[in-house]
Design a protein with these regions (language model features):
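Residues within the helices of the helix-turn-helix
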Residues: 7, 18, 47
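Short, charged recognition helix plus adjacent turn
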Residues: 12, 51, 61-66
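Short alpha-helical DNA-recognition segment
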Residues: 14-30
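A short, Lys/Arg-rich alpha-helix, primarily the initiator
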Residues: 1-12
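DNA major-groove recognition helix of helix-turn-helix/homeodomain DNA-binding modules
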Residues: 44-59
């Protein structure tokens, strides 16, 4: 499943995939794979991404329940 919330949060901060990757010490390809839903990041990486974007884990990585 694509992670459009991550892509949207990254765009809202005006960061490229490479810039976000540099902030969290991973490759641009890793960020791309997470956004495409091809890679499930570790909890440590999820936390790093959230800190870089100023978001919560819930906001970026957990689907809303109805």
């Amino acid at each position: 499943m694509k992670n459009l919330r991550l892509k949207s949060a990254r765009a809202a901060k005006d960061l490229s995939q490479q810039q976000l990757a540099d902030l969290v010490s991973v490759s641009r390809q890793t960020i791309n794979a997470i956004e495409k839903g091809d890679y499930n990041p570790t909890i440590r990486l999820c936390i790093s991404i959230c800190q870089a974007l100023g978001c919560t884990l819930d906001a970026l990585f957990w689907p809303e329940t109805e």
